[in-house]
């Protein structure tokens, strides 16, 4: 259950952070209304809160692992919302990042982690 909870929280954090950044991008770079940026700022704040819900107690570990989720999630977001098509190097790089996430978060550790 802890792995499932971590994965769900990482996905939720990615939606909040990537979605928030995308909303700000839409306002600033694509000329959308200012309130798009406001919603983006709220979503980015929500991301910061969601990260605190991870079962692991170590800030550095959580944020380092989330970085890999962010890389892969950003490519998926771009595909869904902007028509971006990643090349094989984008895909290979994101898979490497996700393997890193699994090692950082779920490798067996002693009690002194």
UniProtKB/Swiss-Prot annotation:
What's the main place this protein lives? Answer: membrane
Q: Where is the signal peptide?
A: none
Q: List localization entries.
A: Cell membrane
Q: Which UniProt keywords apply?
A: Cell membrane, Membrane, Plasmid, Transmembrane, Transmembrane helix
Is NADP among the key words of this record?
Answer: no
Q: Does the keyword RNA-binding apply?
A: no
Which Gene Ontology cellular component terms are annotated?
Answer: plasma membrane
Q: How does it sit in the membrane?
A: Multi-pass membrane protein
Indicate the transmembrane segments per the record.
Answer: 7-27, 33-53, 62-82, 91-111
This protein's superkingdom?
A: Bacteria
Family designation = Belongs to the UPF0060 family.
Q: Which HAMAP family does the entry mention?
A: UPF0060
| Name this polypeptide is given | UPF0060 membrane protein Arth_4423
Lineage from the top down? Bacteria, Bacillati, Actinomycetota, Actinomycetes, Micrococcales
């Amino acid at each position: 259950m802890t792995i499932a909870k971590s994965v769900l929280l990482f996905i939720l954090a990615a939606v909040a952070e990537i979605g928030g950044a995308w909303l700000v991008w839409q306002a600033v770079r694509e000329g959308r209304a200012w309130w798009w940026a406001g919603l983006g700022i709220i979503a980015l704040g929500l991301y910061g809160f969601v990260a605190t819900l991870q079962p692991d107690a170590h800030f550095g570990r959580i944020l380092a692992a989330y970085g890999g989720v962010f890389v892969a999630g950003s490519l998926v977001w771009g595909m869904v919302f902007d028509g971006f098509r990643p090349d094989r190097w984008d895909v290979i790089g994101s898979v490497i990042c996700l393997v890193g996430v699994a090692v950082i978060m779920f490798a067996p550790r002693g009690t002194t982690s």
